[in-house]
UniProtKB/Swiss-Prot annotation:
Low complexity bias locations: 207-216
Described function: Implicated in tumor angiogenesis. May inhibits BMPs activity by blocking their interaction with their receptors. Has a negative regulator effect on the cartilage formation/regeneration from immature mesenchymal cells, by preventing or reducing the rate of matrix accumulation. May play a role during myoblast and osteoblast differentiation, and maturation.
PROSITE patterns, sorted: VWFC_1 (PS01208), VWFC_2 (PS50184)
Leader sequence residues: 1-25
Name of the protein in its database record: Chordin-like protein 2
Basic and acidic residues bias spans: 192-206
Underlying gene: Chrdl2
Keyword hit for Transport: no
Length: 426
């Protein structure tokens, strides 16, 4: 137990007893919710503020469609570390990887939507984003690294008069003992668990089982399909990355600005060698360029893939052109760092650290028409990089084979006269 984290059970029980009664008595059915002299719209979620305790971060309230406020207590998952840490404005403590430099332990960013703050990894509903949705559809959002990702869910029709909100979903389910007993546990697991761990390789499931990651590429770009765990509901396929940019529609599917996909032609099916990008409502499609070199001697052609892959990568095929990563393997393991704060110059910087080298490599990418281009590579001594360590955070782990294949898909780089820098002109 972390000092200062203990909550008096009787006090929390009193809070939980008071919240539903007071909130429902003050709600305006079908319109908005009134709680603590503040007005909330359906789908909004918040931590209640009570005197004299202040904000109760271990309690979460949500305004429902019928104007009622549902409040529930969050439960913290068990931790497998000797010295968990407690961060401000959080309910649960978390483990910190002891191998991460202290300067890189930057708190994950929260999200702001409709004057409500959501923590990294938190799931919530925001119905007003899709006013033209069907009656059996709802809007589910997720906060990831300070960015809000939302999409439509099609919900099954409950076959009972009394319903409750599903955990990790915006759909409703029938009220029964199973749902009641698992609601708090499942919700807490998604909101405050380690699914979005700051170091994806810090978890260990077993001596021979690779630890999962929350990222789908060596650089940690957000995966296109946001998987939900709603019971019987449809997987979200619409992601809103930039609310001020126009989305694209192709073959009955909607893609947000900057999103990339393989088009489907009715006569031929999916086109794995064609890649389309949504650029502010315009579809920009081009042919995929396969790498000329592979980290293996005999790459194989696999059905559904445009480019050949190495046999060792077949088990990790996730039906995507982006190569998925697992935890670093020895030898040839790398750590990937990124800037803790967004860069104002539209450049994205990633630092690759090899444990066996006294240098790190800084890769600078530029976003051009929705596509990332590698524009510069710098080699910096580790001791010099440590001076800027507080500006970076650990993103993920990868190994040499995947990184080689990833870079092989970028435009050709020309080495300049300086041995410490590689540049390319767009």
């Amino acid at each position: 137990m972390v000092p200062g984290v203990r909550i008096i059970p009787s006090l929390l029980g009193l809070v939980m007893f008071w919240l539903p009664l007071d909130s429902q008595a003050r709600s305006r059915s079908g319109k908005v919710c009134l709680f603590g002299e503040k007005i909330y719209t359906p789908g909004q979620s918040w931590h209640p503020y009570l005197e004299p305790q202040g904000t109760i971060y271990c309690v979460r309230c949500t305004c429902s469609e019928n104007g009622h406020v549902n409040c529930y207590r969050l439960r913290c998952p068990p931790l497998h570390c000797s010295q968990p840490v407690m961060e401000p404005q959080q309910c649960c403590p978390r483990c910190v990887d002891p191998h991460v430099p202290s300067g890189l332990r930057v708190p994950l960013k929260s999200c702001q939507l409709n004057e409500t703050t959501y923590q990294h990894g938190e799931i919530f509903s925001a119905q007003e984003l899709f006013p033209a949705r069907l009656s059996n559809q709802c809007v589910l959002c997720s906060c990831i690294e300070g960015h809000t990702y939302c999409g439509l869910m099609t919900c099954p029709e409950p076959s009972c008069p009394t319903t409750l909100p599903l955990p990790d979903s915006c759909c409703q389910t029938c009220k029964d003992r199973t749902t009641e007993s698992s609601t708090e546990e499942n919700l807490t697991q998604l909101q405050h668990g380690e699914r979005h761990s700051q170091d994806p390789c810090s978890e260990r499931r077993g001596p021979s089982t690779p630890a999962p990651t929350s990222l789908s590429s060596p650089l940690g770009f957000i995966p296109r399909h946001f998987q939900s765990v709603g019971m019987g509901s449809t997987t979200i396929k619409i992601i809103l990355k930039e609310k001020h940019k126009k989305a694209c529609t192709h073959n009955g599917k909607t893609y947000s600005h900057g999103e990339v996909w393989h088009p489907t032609v009715l006569s031929f099916g999916p086109m794995p060698c064609i890649l389309c990008t949504c650029i502010d409502g315009y579809q920009d499609c081009h042919r995929v360029t396969c790498p000329t070199q592979y980290p293996c001697s005999q790459p194989k052609k696999v059905a559904g893939k445009c480019c050949k892959i190495c046999p060792e990568d077949e088990a990790e095929d996730d039906h995507s052109e982006v190569i998925s990563t697992r935890c670093p393997k020895v030898p040839g393991q790398f750590h990937v760092y990124t800037l803790a704060s967004p860069s104002p110059d539209s450049l994205h910087r990633f630092v690759l650290e090899h444990e066996a080298s006294d240098q790190v490599e800084m890769y600078i990418w530029k976003l051009v028409k929705g596509i990332y281009h590698l524009v510069q590579i710098k080699r910096v001594r580790k001791q010099d990089f440590q001076k800027e360590a507080q500006n970076f955070r650990l993103l993920t782990g990868t190994h040499e084979g995947y990184w080689t294949v990833f870079l092989a898909q970028t435009p050709e780089l020309k080495v300049t006269a300086s041995p410490d820098k590689v540049t390319k002109t767009l």
